[in-house]
Design a protein with these regions (language model features):
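Contiguous transmembrane helix-bundle modules in multi-pass membrane proteins
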Residues: 1-128, 133, 215-257
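Soluble non-transmembrane domains of integral membrane proteins
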Residues: 118-208
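Short beta-strand-plus-loop segments that form exposed binding edges in beta-rich domains
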Residues: 211-213
Length: 257
C-alpha cells in the first residue's frame, strides 16, 4: 500500500513548481516539456545501469523517473528574477529537493541492493554484481582492551581495484565476548561493506558481503529537508534581494532673495 501512495505523492509533487498562490500560472512550454523528458531519460538510464544487479524493476524505474522529474521541475522553475532570493523560497526549494533525493536513494537501496554469503579464501574470488572480492590475507591485532584478527579484501570492478576492505573479529577478554567490526568502503554512488563470520580454515572465513547503491543520498535528502525547514522558520527576509533603482531627487527651487 505504501509504495503506490508514495508514487502518487511524487507524481503530485512534480506539479508543485507550476502552482501559485490562489491561481495556476501559465508556464512556458519548455518548463512543461523539459522536466518530464529529463526525468524519463536520466531515470531510464539510471535503472538500466543496474541491470547487472538483477532484473529491471518497473516500480524502481517509475520512482526514478518521478524523482528526477521533480528535481528538474524545481531547478527549472526556480529563478531569482521576481522576488529575489529569500529564506522562505530557498527553504522551499531545499525541502522539496531533499524529498526527491531521499526518495531516489530509498528506491535504489530497495530495488538494486545486493548481498551474498560465502566462505572466502585465497585463490577463490567472489562475484557480487559488478564487483569481485578477493582475499588478500589476515593479521593479528592487539587493541586497548581487545585482541582481533583483521582480514584484508581487495574489491575490483573489471580489471581496476576500486577499494580495500578490512573487517575485524574482536575478542574482549573483560566481557568474554566477540564482536565483529565491518569493513566499509563508502562513496557518493554506493557503499560496499563486509561482515566477518567464523573462521572456517587456516585462510578461509565465512563472510556476508553487501552493496547498497545511493544509500548516502537518503541522509543527504534528510539533511536538505532539515535545512529547508530551518530556513522557512527563519522568516521571509530576502537574502539576496535585488537593489531598487535609485530615483534622482528633484532639484530644490531656489529661494527668492
Amino acid at each position: 500500500v505504501f509504495v503506490p501512495l508514495a508514487l502518487v505523492l511524487m507524481a503530485l509533487m512534480t506539479q508543485i513548481p507550476r502552482l501559485r498562490w490562489q491561481c495556476l500560472a501559465a508556464s512556458p512550454p519548455i518548463k512543461r516539456i523539459v522536466p518530464p523528458l529529463l526525468g524519463l531519460l536520466v531515470g531510464g538510464l539510471l535503472s538500466l545501469g543496474y541491470r547487472d544487479l538483477g532484473a529491471l524493476s518497473w516500480v524502481g524505474l517509475v520512482a526514478n523517473v518521478l524523482s528526477l522529474w521533480l528535481v528538474a521541475s524545481l531547478l527549472l522553475n526556480f529563478s531569482f528574477k521576481t522576488h529575489g532570493l529569500s529564506a522562505n523560497r530557498l527553504g522551499s526549494l531545499l525541502a522539496h529537493l531533499g524529498v526527491a533525493i531521499c526518495a531516489l536513494g530509498i528506491n535504489q537501496v530497495s530495488h538494486y541492493s545486493q548481498e551474498g554469503g560465502t566462505v572466502l579464501k585465497a585463490g577463490s574470488p567472489y562475484q557480487l554484481g559488478a564487483y569481485t572480492f578477493r582475499y588478500e590475507g589476515n593479521e593479528p591485532l592487539i587493541g586497548p582492551n581487545y585482541t582481533a584478527e583483521r582480514i584484508t579484501l581487495s574489491v575490483h570492478k573489471g580489471a581496476k581495484e576500486v577499494a580495500r576492505l578490512m573487517p575485524e573479529r574482536r575478542h574482549y577478554s573483560v566481557r568474554t565476548m566477540n564482536m565483529n567490526e565491518p569493513g566499509i568502503a563508502w562513496g557518493l554512488f554506493g557503499d560496499l561493506y563486509v561482515v566477518l563470520g567464523e573462521k572456517m580454515g587456516p585462510d578461509a572465513y565465512a563472510m556476508r558481503l553487501h552493496y547498497k547503491p545511493l544509500v548516502r543520498w537518503i541522509w543527504l535528502g534528510g539533511m536538505l529537508m532539515m535545512a529547508g525547514g530551518a530556513l522557512r522558520l527563519s522568516g521571509r527576509k530576502p537574502l539576496l534581494a535585488s537593489r531598487p533603482a535609485k530615483i534622482p531627487r528633484p532639484l530644490r527651487e531656489q529661494e527668492a532673495p
